[in-house]
Amino acid sequence: MARSIVVLGAQWGDEGKGKIVDWLTSRAQYVVRYQGGHNAGHTIVVDQQKITLHLIPSGILHNHVTAVIANGVVLSPFSLIKEMKMLLKLGVSTCKRIFISASCPLLLPYHVAMDLARENHHISKAIGTTGCGIGPSYEDKVARRALRVSDLYNLKYFKNKLKDVVDYYNFQLVYYYKTKPINYQIVLEEVMSISDILIDMVVDVPELLDDAAKRGDSVIFEGAQGSLLDIDHGTYPYVTSSHTIAGSVSVGAGVGLNYIDYVLGIVKAYSTRVGFGPFPTELSNDTGNWLCMNGNEFGSTTGRRRRTGWFDAVSVRYSVKINSFFSCCLTKIDVLDGLKELKICIAYRKKNGKVIHNFPCSLEELENCVPIYEILPGWMISTVGITEFHQLPKESQLYVKRIEELIGVPIHIVSTGSDRSAIIILRNPFDS
C-alpha cells in the first residue's frame, strides 16, 4: 500500500493539483510543499466555497493533517502570514499545524522589485513571470547570498547580511533599471515584526518525515507549476526557476528516493499555458475562447487569461517519461461538455515535413512544429458531478481511454467538476 505519494502537474501548470491533493490528504497525516513559492495557485472548492492557496499546502483544510513547507520552497514570510490569517477567518486552525524548514530561502521585497523591473525593462524578451520574485530568490540561493529562515536566529548577522543584499539589489534597480530603490530599514522592520512567528514554526523536516515513515504515517508531496515548466526539462527559457519534476522531491524535502512509493501525474483534459513560450496546440479562435470561458481559465495568482488549446499527447507522454508516473488523474473533463468534436494531438510535423512523436528539446524546433490531430466525437450530456465511470457518456469514456492509450499510463482518477466531491476513482493510489 502506498504511503508516500507525489502529486505533480504533467503540463504547464494549472492542471487542478490542489483539488486532488485535498482529496488524497483525507487519508494522509502530512502534506509537503517542496519547490516553488507563492507563485502557485491551488484552488479547492468545498461546499461551493472557493479557497485558493499559494504557499500553504492544500491538505491544510483537513484538520488532522500537518502541513510542511520544506527547504526547496522560496518562502515569502508575508505571504505565509497573510494566508494563515485568511485560513483563520475561514475557521481553519493553523496553530501547530504548519511547519517550515530553517533552510528555506526568504523571498523579500527586493526580489519582487527585481522581478518586475526585469519584465518591464525587457518587454520584448519577457518570460511572463507572475511577478512574485521567484526567479531572483532562486538566483540568490544558487549564488549563496540568500537570507534563510535560519539566519533569523542571529539578529546581528541577519541585519548585516540584509544590508549587503539590499545594497546589491539597489545598485541594479537604480542604475540599470532606473527604478526606485528598496528601503532597507522598512524591510528589516517588517521581517522583525514576524520573525518570532517564523522561528516558532521551524522544524527539522527530514527528521519529521523520517519519523512519519517509521510510524507508518502517509505523506503527500504537493508539486507546484507543471513538468513542462521545469528549469531543466521544460521549454527553456520560458520556464519557472525551480525543478518541477518528481526527482526534485528528494532535494526539495530532504528524503531519499526510496521514500517515494507512488507518483501521480495530474493532466487537464485540454491544454493551457500562462505567459509566453511555445504552445503547439494553442487555439486562437472561438473554440479556444470557449475553453477559456467555460473552464474559467484565469490565473489564480495573477488573474491573467490563460492560453488554451487541444490536448497534447506528445508533451504529456514526455512528462510521463521524465517523472515515471504510476498513473494519471484527468481533470476538467466537464469543461468539454457541449463540444461536437474533440481533437487530440498525436504527433508533430516539423518545418521540413518530417513527422515526430517525441517532444523536441530545442525551443526553435518546438516553435516550428505543427500538431497532427486525431478527431474524436464530443458529447452533449453534462458530466458535472458524475462519480462513476460507467455513468459518463460513451464518447467521454472513449476520450479518456484514448488519452490513456496515447500517454502510456493508466488514468485512475477522473475529475468531473470543481467541487471536491466531483470525482471518479477507478483505482485509489493508496490501495496500489
UniProtKB/Swiss-Prot annotation:
It comes from the Bacteria. One of its GO terms (cellular component) is cytoplasm. It catalyses: IMP + L-aspartate + GTP = N(6)-(1,2-dicarboxyethyl)-AMP + GDP + phosphate + 2 H(+). Pathway: Purine metabolism; AMP biosynthesis via de novo pathway; AMP from IMP: step 1/2. Its main location: cytoplasm. Substrate binds at residues 300-306. GTP binds at residues 13-19, 41-43, 306, 332-334, 415-417. SUPFAM superfamilies: P-loop containing nucleoside triphosphate hydrolases (SSF52540). IMP binds at residues 14-17, 39-42, 130, 144, 225, 240, 304. It is an enzyme of class 6 (ligase). Gene3D superfamilies: Adenylosuccinate Synthetase, subunit A, domain 1, Adenylosuccinate Synthetase, subunit A, domain 2, Adenylosuccinate Synthetase, subunit A, domain 3. Keywords: Cytoplasm, GTP-binding, Ligase, Magnesium, Metal-binding, Nucleotide-binding, Purine biosynthesis. InterPro entries: Adenylosuccin_syn_GTP-bd, Adenylosuccin_syn_Lys_AS, Adenylosuccinate_synth_dom1, Adenylosuccinate_synth_dom2, Adenylosuccinate_synth_dom3, Adenylosuccinate_synthetase, P-loop_NTPase. The active site is at residues 14, 42. GO terms for molecular function: adenylosuccinate synthase activity; GTP binding; magnesium ion binding. Its EC number is 6.3.4.4. It holds the Pfam family Adenylsucc_synt. Mg(2+) binds at residues 14, 41. It is found in: Cytoplasm. The keyword Acyltransferase does not apply. CDD domains: AdSS (cd03108). Belongs to the adenylosuccinate synthetase family. Homodimer. Plays an important role in the de novo pathway of purine nucleotide biosynthesis. Catalyzes the first committed step in the biosynthesis of AMP from IMP. This is Adenylosuccinate synthetase. It comes from Blochmanniella pennsylvanica (strain BPEN). The lineage of its organism: Bacteria, Pseudomonadati, Pseudomonadota, Gammaproteobacteria, Enterobacterales. The gene is purA.
